Amino acid sequence: MKGSEYALLVARETLAEHYKEVEAFQTARAKSARRLSKVIAAVATIAVLGNVAQAFTIATMVPLIRLVPVYLWIRPDGTVDSEVSVSRLPATQEEAVVNASLWEYVRLRESYDADTAQYAYDLVSNFSAPMVRQNYQQFFNYPNPTSPQVILGKHGRLEVEHIASNDVTPGVQQIRYKRTLIVDGKMPMASTWTATVRYEKVTSLPGRLRLTNPGGLVVTSYQTSEDTVSNAGHSEP
């Protein structure tokens, strides 16, 4: 046989020393792996606790069930800006929100169409303080003989067009409008009216009502008077 086919003899003392070195190396690696696992677990725990704390802080500062309206407007240079509070809008933008909301209230209260009567009834009721709401509902509901439901039903309608809005005092606005009575088979009859609206701004309005009342307005007093003499139309209390 050739010499390369024979294994080299290793002294027993040398072999024992080699085994000790291998065992010590493996033990050191195992300890290092355990330490690394503990560090990773600690970092993961801290990250989870941090995320939980952050989520709790956000939920406390901004309740998730709260609906916050965002107002958008176009600046003179063409850029778009936004704000979440009416009181922090530029004066002209806050006035625009108030004017639009009050006009929508008057328009739906003074107009009538059988197809949209329920929507108008609900919005006007939600916009109104308790006493104003009661007066409106007593006027509009059956069996009041002056209610447009009784007089017009599905055979006519009242159309309302805006003329002007003017602030009388803080929290009081007068709105002039044209109202046209249209009855099937008859000539339309137009008249002009003025509505005097007293209102307040509230911050505790439920989220569902903010969708149709972003300004948070509540009408506390409402009166109408006819400007022109006409045999068409009427005014509720």
From Swiss-Prot:
Q: How does it sit in the membrane?
A: Single-pass membrane protein
Q: Tell me the residue ranges located in the Cytoplasmic compartment per UniProt.
A: 1-38
Query: What would be one Gene Ontology cellular-component term for the protein?
Result: type IV secretion system complex
Its localization reads: Cell inner membrane
Enumerate the transmembrane spans: 39-61
What the entry lists under InterPro entries is as follows: NTF2-like_dom_sf (IPR032710), VirB8 (IPR007430)
Pfam families the record matches: VirB8
Single GO biological process annotation from the record: protein secretion by the type IV secretion system
Keywords associated with the record: Cell inner membrane, Cell membrane, Crown gall tumor, Membrane, Plasmid, Transmembrane, Transmembrane helix
Q: Family assignment? A: Belongs to the virB8 family.
Quaternary structure?
Homodimer.
Indicate what this protein is called per its UniProt record: Protein virB8
Q: Which organism is it from?
A: Agrobacterium fabrum (strain C58 / ATCC 33970)
